């Protein structure tokens, strides 16, 4: 097996294209087989196998830093850094963590948790790099769910203001920021990151700024005209308008295409966002059909995807669901609030019985809901 040759960071770079194709399928099979026994986050990890491989092929994790937002999608990253054997004890006491841990491996750049922290953490590392005069890449990988958290936007706002070289990878497995516009989009991506374009852009701006009185005004008008043209062709103008260069969207199942865009991102001066479209549960049909069920799962039957529950043990979520139902029936003033996770929190039954008393947040926006409650 090709997977058996991955013992440490950068071993993946010794593989040819055929072996890389074999490896991605072996990792997919490995994850399904092992998580079926131990439980864990399956759907999200199956969706980022190719993205993670592309990141490891594009960067040197003995030096460069990759921060995974939330971190539950870092299983392939753990495999590619030589921790395959640790999956026997995944998420068990004394075993391998289901999230990045700096104590576990030097390639885990940041102890992540829930949620929306990766861009801030990456920005801090990028600033530290500038202050110490070091030379390495910093990459923050954030999902579309975590991108709904206000902290992420605060960090992007600061990144654009500081003009620090910094790469953000948007792992988009749900929302549609934009549609791929084909050849024109690819052309614009490559053109805007070419050395000739970047040098010309800086040269023209500096020259115009030196013209007395009218120079700055001319630069502003050119920028406004350029922005208007880009609105017609370039997706992700939300990020562009924040001062963050946008590249993508790119097919998250195509390692070659992801590597190509990451190479372009390395050439950008200042913050850049790479938009990667992935599919939760990719390659395992039960997880593709029911990604929410396989977001965080216990042991399950591989052939059917059906959970292997131990009937003698009561699950906390089930007990909570029953208690909430009884409280809702007994007390009409009880209101249930969840962060867009009715299934995972055991509130789906309450939602169905008392829809008018069920409030769901818009993804990662707990502060916005908790403050009015107080």
Task: Please name every model-derived segment.
Residues 76-82, 147-156, 178-183, 189, ...:
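Short acidic, glycine/serine/threonine-rich loops at helix termini
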Residues 41-162, 316, 327, 332-339, ...:
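Cofactor-binding active-site loop characterized by glycine-rich and histidine/acidic residues
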């Amino acid at each position: 097996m090709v997977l058996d040759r991955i013992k440490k960071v950068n071993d993946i770079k010794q593989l040819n294209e055929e072996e890389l194709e074999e490896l991605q399928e072996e990792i997919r099979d490995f994850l399904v087989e092992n998580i079926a026994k131990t439980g864990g986050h399956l759907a999200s990890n199956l969706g980022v196998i190719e993205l993670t491989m592309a990141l490891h092929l594009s960067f040197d994790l003995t030096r460069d830093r990759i921060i995974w937002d939330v971190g539950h999608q870092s299983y392939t990253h753990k495999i590619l850094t030589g921790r395959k054997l640790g999956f026997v004890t995944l998420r068990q006491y004394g075993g391998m963590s289901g999230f990045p841990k700096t104590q576990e491996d030097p390639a885990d750049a940041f102890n992540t948790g829930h949620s929306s922290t990766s861009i801030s953490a990456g920005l801090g590392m990028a600033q530290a790099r500038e202050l110490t005069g070091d030379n390495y890449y910093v990459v923050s990988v954030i999902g579309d769910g975590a991108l709904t958290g206000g902290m992420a936007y605060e960090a992007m706002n600061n990144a654009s203001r500081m003009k620090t070289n910094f790469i953000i990878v948007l792992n988009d497995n749900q929302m549609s920021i934009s549609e791929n516009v084909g050849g024109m989009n690819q052309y614009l991506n490559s053109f805007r990151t070419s050395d000739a374009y970047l040098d010309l852009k800086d040269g023209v701006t500096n020259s115009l700024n030196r013209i007395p009185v009218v120079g700055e005004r001319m630069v502003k008008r050119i920028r406004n005209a350029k922005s208007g043209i880009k609105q017609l062709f370039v997706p992700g103008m939300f990020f562009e308008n924040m001062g963050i260069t946008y590249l993508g969207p790119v097919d998250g199942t195509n390692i070659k295409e992801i590597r190509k865009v990451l190479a372009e991102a390395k050439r950008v001066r200042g913050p850049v966002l790479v938009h990667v479209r992935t599919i939760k549960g990719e390659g395992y049909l039960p997880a593709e059909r029911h990604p929410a069920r396989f977001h965080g799962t216990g042991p399950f039957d591989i052939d059917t995807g059906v959970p292997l529950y131990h009937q003698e043990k009561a699950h906390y979520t089930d007990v909570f669901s029953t208690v909430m139902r009884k409280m809702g029936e007994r007390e009409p003033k009880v209101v249930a609030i969840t962060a867009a996770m009715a299934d995972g929190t055991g509130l789906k039954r309450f939602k169905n019985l008392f829809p008018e008393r069920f409030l769901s947040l818009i993804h990662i926006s707990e502060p916005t809901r908790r403050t009015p409650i107080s």
